[in-house]
């Protein structure tokens, strides 16, 4: 996948020179969210948001006609469970994307190195986890580039192509700027309240949320700070594979979209 990422970064940077300025687009903050479906059908973000994400090459969903799913984790800080999560992923030969912050890179460098060594993608969750709609264009670039540079320094991975905006807050301006700087925003179509470390409810809570919400093309968001997630992951992966789902990487998703619509993505 490293060769694809190098090629993709080059292509994205090339087209960024021809991007329109972000000064003319809206900076109205949008909080990512959707009405959950429990009938194994993908949620619909609505025509306006779908068009906005497509305009800037962002994703929240894969192909809803295929039982292919994408496992992603947000790593704001280390809470002692990432090693177990990595062990489970290795056991099942499943690759994921881990969106890390500057704090995580500074405090858990060995885990970040392990992620890349074991075939996972390290994504960008910004250096200091700000609301991107409240900071300048220069600051947005610094937030993203600092993570990307540190990941490359630690692991050799060529850039953090994929960005998950902190707290899911974004605007058309932040989408335009991140694309201009060579990044692609990745949202999600399956998530639940799992980040409250003092309100964990047991592995079954996480397992049921994943299995009840799963749908073709799902981009799954989990937080590594959750003991429930770490304890549920093994059984969840077993069940999903038994149901015929295949785990794919974000590189697979983007490559597929680029071949389908080369001038859009």
Curated annotation (Swiss-Prot):
UniProt keyword list: Hydrolase, Signal
SUPFAM superfamilies from the UniProt entry: Glycoside hydrolase/deacetylase
Pfam families named in the record: Polysacc_deac_1 (PF01522)
One of the GO biological process terms: carbohydrate metabolic process
Transmembrane keyword on record: no
Signal peptide: 1-23
Presence of keyword Repeat: no
GO MF term (any one): hydrolase activity, acting on carbon-nitrogen (but not peptide) bonds
Domain NodB homology: 67-248
Top EC group: hydrolase
EC numbers for this chain: 3.5.1.-
Cellular component, GO, one term: membrane
PROSITE patterns, alphabetized: NODB (PS51677), PROKAR_LIPOPROTEIN (PS51257)
InterPro entries (alphabetical): Glyco_hydro/deAcase_b/a-brl (IPR011330), NODB_dom (IPR002509), Polysacc_deacetylase_ArnD (IPR050248), Spore_PdaA (IPR014235)
Family from the record: Belongs to the polysaccharide deacetylase family.
Protein name: Uncharacterized 30.6 kDa protein in fumA 3'region
